[in-house]
From Swiss-Prot:
Keyword Lipoprotein tagged: no
Active site per the UniProt annotation: H20 (proton acceptor)
Family membership: Belongs to the 4-hydroxy-2-oxovalerate aldolase family.
Binding site for Mn(2+): D17, H199, H201
Enzyme Commission code(s) on record: 4.1.3.39
Lineage, opening ranks: Bacteria, Pseudomonadati, Pseudomonadota, Betaproteobacteria, Burkholderiales
GO molecular function: 2-isopropylmalate synthase activity; 4-hydroxy-2-oxovalerate aldolase activity; manganese ion binding
Protein name: 4-hydroxy-2-oxovalerate aldolase
InterPro entries recorded: 2-IPM_HCS-like, 4OH_2_O-val_aldolase, Aldolase_TIM, DmpG_comm, DRE_TIM_HOA, PYR_CT
Matching PANTHER family: 2-ISOPROPYLMALATE SYNTHASE 1, CHLOROPLASTIC-RELATED (PTHR10277:SF9), HOMOCITRATE SYNTHASE-RELATED (PTHR10277)
The entry's keywords: Aromatic hydrocarbons catabolism, Lyase, Manganese, Metal-binding
């Protein structure tokens, strides 16, 4: 389809997915600087929570520098135009977290499940719609299901009340042909008024290309992050995606120069390490492994002497998915024992 003149909503991930490489330790001042910069650049929707969503603070996922309430309560009053979203993964976040987010002024709730487990989202999606929130069903690790399975899961979320469904490439594994096939199939199966979104990771350097293909296939919401700050090799870099959209005539409403300045002047100096496709991040995309596993694997490498990329390959072989972070150390320990005394 032609995309010239098409208007899309870009959704910034810097303050949520970007929490993963920051080990959830963003300060309130960093949150404020990024959020107000994005708002001034014209970004319409900004996600703010622990990297694993509302309620993510735990031994399993990591304790943040501040609570979700503190982050949201700090950012939301500062924004002039942008709205704020929050991620909620059933089993981590609860309906109480959802109500808290609504009370604080969160506009959009994104209820995320593994791509074959949409049935666990009914309670949260239904409540979000009752609360008159913009309600998104977020199908993670979408490379793990074929188009027909994704259609059935998307329709479940739609039936619960979701007004937008996301195809989520959590591993940065998908290539443009697969994105086209799956987004086109799901778009055709949903009601016309239900929006379609795409969330990419840059582990195989496909974030921008996959996002463009998703727009060409009917997606109207695209996730990206300033300077790509996100799990693994990062999310689709927002400033690059905006530049490509400008070239293609896709309307985003985002000022390219201001977006570049947020990325270069605010986000890059915040990074604890460069967000790039290093050998371990590359393996995430190559083996189809959940992007937020990266730092867990790097920590296990130091503890057990097994290389992070070998651990990630093993996690891919086992088919491990988001929520199984506690099994990463177990896998590394098993691999180390197989090689001899630790």
């Amino acid at each position: 389809m032609t995309v010239k003149g098409k208007r899309i909503t870009v959704h910034d991930m810097t303050l949520r997915d970007g929490m993963h490489p920051k080990r959830h330790q963003m300060t309130l001042d960093q949150m404020k600087a990024v959020a107000t910069g994005l708002d001034a650049a014209g970004v319409p929707l900004i996600e703010v929570t622990h990297g694993d969503g509302l309620g993510g603070a735990s031994v399993n996922y990591g304790f943040p520098a501040h609570t979700d309430e503190e982050y949201l309560g700090t950012v939301i009053p500062l924004l002039k135009l942008a709205k704020v979203s929050a991620l909620l993964i059933p089993g981590i976040g609860t309906v109480d977290h959802l109500r808290m987010a609504k009370d604080l002024g969160v506009h959009t709730i994104r209820v995320a499940t593994h791509c074959t487990e949409a049935d666990v989202s009914e309670q949260h999606i239904s409540l979000a719609r009752q609360l008159e929130m913009d309600t998104v069903g977020f199908l993670m690790m979408a490379h793990k299901a074929d188009s027909q399975r994704l259609i059935s899961q998307a329709r479940l979320m739609e039936s619960y009340g979701a007004n937008c469904i996301y195809i989520t490439d959590s591993a940065g594994y998908m290539l443009p042909a697969e994105v086209k096939e799956k987004t086109s199939a799901v778009r055709a199966a949903l009601r016309p008024e239900t929006e379609l979104g795409f969330h990419g990771h840059h582990n195989l350097a496909m974030g921008v290309a996959n996002s463009v293909v998703a727009v060409e296939s009917g997606a109207t919401r695209i996730d990206a992050a300033a300077a790509g700050l996100g799990a693994g090799a990062g999310n689709t870099p927002m400033e690059v995606f905006i530049a490509v959209c400008n070239r293609m005539g896709i309307a985003t409403g985002v000022d390219l120069f201001k977006m570049q300045d947020v990325a270069e002047d605010i986000v890059v100096p915040m990074m604890d390490h460069p967000i790039r496709i290093d050998r371990d991040a590359l393996i995430l995309g190559y083996a189809g492994v959940y992007s937020s596993f990266l730092l867990f694997a790097k920590r296990a490498e130091k503890k057990y002497g097994v290389s992070a990329r070998e651990i990630l390959i093993e996690l891919g072989r086992r088919g491990m998915v988001g929520g199984q972070e506690d099994m990463i150390e177990d896998a590394a320990m098993t691999m180390a024992k197989a090689r001899g005394p630790i």
